Amino acid sequence: MLKINFIKTDDSNIINEFRKKLYKTFVAPIDSMWQDLYIASSQAYLIEKDNKQIGYCCIDNNGALLQIFVNAENKYLMQTIIRNLIDSKLISSASLSSIEPLSFNACLFHSISMQTNTFCYEYSNRALDDENSLNVELVTPEFSNAIRSYYKDHVGFDDTFGYVDNLVSRKELFMALEYDTIIATGECRLSDAQLDYADVGVSVNTQHRKKGLATKMLQQMAHKAIKQDRNPICSTTIDNIGSQKAIERAGFYCSNIIFDINLI
């Protein structure tokens, strides 16, 4: 009789070896925020069949499956493994993208409902618009405190863990100034896990919104990525209509979607 077990683990080396294989199966890049924020903070489990490790999965505190992989010779078991996760009460839902069809479809098979969570975009390699004269400069350490204050006031993000300092040290954070006021910021984060990609993102001063600054900054970040031989990607949630419009105007297209899938 087939015996499948799920073993909690904090052994990142084993998980990373499996994850490298998972990444090779993706039909589009994974969003770095999803990987670095949500998946990274979830609980990893090794999947064992007859006492042999065949893959892993990641489950958050709410019982949502965020990532799962099984090796090639055991792919046929994916639907069974999802069923076992449900029956063992380890998961009640999944938040997965269509970039990995095997696990995504297995969860759809067991689903009772689903909702769209996040749109993930790739760049269409559009040329920089002639009218894009936004003056963008690299953020240097002396501006770090100003950026932190800007994020708190205009984004609602209180950086207490060195986020800004990390981006500045990696030369991945940019800003646009009007006189001495930060009117927009841009990030061009070179992925350490997906070496062909860079995640780009922007924010706009609350007093300077609806002027097209987000689109212009996104275009600038996209071209900074391309100059470093990286393909720009970005994402936004379903409820952020303004961001969706700015992203699409900048020349990005939605290549995959992260769905919340209810399993029970």
Which stretches of residues belong to each language-model region?
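A short, aromatic/hydrophobic, helix- or strand-capping loop or linear motif
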Residues: F26-D36, S95-I99, F157-L167
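Conserved beta-strand-loop-alpha-helix junction that forms the acyl-donor binding cleft
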Residues: S95-A106, C234-K245, Y253, N262-I264
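Flexible, substrate/cofactor-facing loop regions flanked by secondary structure
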Residues: D130-A198
